[in-house]
Design a protein with these regions (language model features):
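MFS-fold secondary transporters
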Residues: 141-145, 160, 238
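Helix-loop junctions on the cytosolic side of multi-pass membrane transporters
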Residues: 35-44, 220, 227, 232-255
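A helix-boundary/kink motif common to multi-pass secondary transporters
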Residues: 126-127, 148-149, 219-220, 302
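Substrate-agnostic recognition of the 12-TM MFS/MFS-like secondary transporter fold
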Residues: 70-91, 103-122, 126-129, 134-138, ...
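A membrane-interface helix-boundary motif in multi-pass transporters
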Residues: 9-20, 213-229, 303-313
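Short extramembrane helix-to-coil loop segments that connect adjacent transmembrane helices in Major
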Residues: 92-102, 296-312
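Cytosolic juxtamembrane N-terminal segment immediately preceding the first transmembrane helix
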Residues: 2-75
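Juxtamembrane intracellular "pre-TM" segments in multi-pass secondary transporters
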Residues: 47-65, 243-276
Length: 322
């Protein structure tokens, strides 16, 4: 019965049978893990109740729920657009016949370099402007992905390095400042970020499915076109929901060299250094796995079987956020 159902879905969707089998195995694995978790008293429901218990003594001010929903709406649309781009990037560059490793490495290096001053620049010129700048950069980057020229794609990867710094700093910074400016309880910041993390995991899964639909409709460039539309929606939401806020005035008065020196002093603390090294090694291993995932999958499948679909590409992305 299950085999016939899978065959029917395969014919209806036009996807290889093995992708549906893989998805079925993943779903069954999640269900099995859920049952095991319940057996040992660590179910998702129990964990949620435990987390909510920490907020029972906190009075939720009027207007906070709406404020939180607006932020989460922006954040999740932005993350959905970002996840959409990762599904077919390797296969798109492969179809162009360009140096894939150099393009990926360019993005990683630029992200590391820009992270030294991106935060201070955003604090000075405004977090809302930083969010809008991120959206503008992402639209331009995804437009550049349409051109099968190494130089154009390289420029896009440089811009992508800067936009990545903004993605993982400016939105959260805006929320914390806006939250405190409204005098909301500090404990509710943790609640918001907890919901954002859970929603981000769901967005990664949904992005894989949507990317497959977009790729079926428009080819390898399809997910990037969908990401443009989602990013435009995110920019509109930022313009509607966000007000402007800035970083600490004392930090703004510091020069770049002073901020860099202060950062080095912080890194001299053994606990901070250990955390930084652990994060560096973990991220390095994870991104190596992500980069090698697609070519390994293609090699395993072989030329006689259809190329792995975007459904299989979201798994490495989900792993990177754990």
């Amino acid at each position: 019965m299950l085999l016939s159902l899978a065959a029917t879905l395969s014919d209806a969707l036009g996807w290889p049978l093995w992708t549906l089998y893989t998805l079925s195995v993943l779903v069954c694995s999640v269900m099995l893990l859920s049952l095991v978790s319940r057996a040992v008293g660590l179910s998702v429901a129990a964990a949620t109740k435990k987390a909510d218990a920490g907020f029972k003594g906190v009075e939720v001010p009027a207007g906070f729920a709406e404020f939180q929903r607006k932020y989460l709406a922006v954040f999740l649309v932005v993350m959905l657009a970002d996840w959409m781009q990762g599904t077919n990037m390797w296969t798109l560059y492969d179809s162009y016949g360009v140096d894939i490793g150099t393009l990926f490495l360019t993005g990683f290096i630029c992200s590391a370099v820009f992270s030294l001053f991106a935060g201070s620049l955003v604090d000075k010129f405004g977090r809302k402007r930083g969010c809008l700048l991120y959206c503008a950069l992402e639209v331009v980057i995804n437009v550049l992905e349409h051109y099968p020229t190494f130089e154009v794609l390289w420029v896009g990867r440089v811009m992508g390095g800067f936009s990545t710094c903004l993605l993982f700093s400016v939105f959260e910074s805006w929320y914390v400042s806006a939250h405190r400016a409204r005098k909301y309880p500090e404990e509710l910041i943790e609640q918001t970020f907890s919901k954002a993390t859970q929603g981000n995991g769901l967005a990664a899964v949904v992005a894989g499915l949507l990317a497959q639909v977009a790729a079926d409709a428009a080819g390898e460039i399809g997910p990037f076109q969908a990401a443009i539309a989602l990013t435009v929606v995110a920019a509109v939401l930022v313009a509607m929901f966000f007000d402007e806020n800035y970083g600490d005035q004392r930090a703004q008065d510091q020069s770049l060299s002073q901020s860099f020196t202060q950062g080095l002093q912080t890194l001299k603390s053994p606990p901070v250094m250990l955390v930084a090294m652990g994060g560096t090694f973990y991220e390095g291993a994870t991104y190596t796995f992500v980069f090698m995932w697609v070519p390994v999958m293609i090699g395993l499948v072989g030329a006689s079987v259809p190329t792995p679909s975007a459904i299989s590409y979201w798994l490495p992305g989900v792993l990177t956020q754990q």
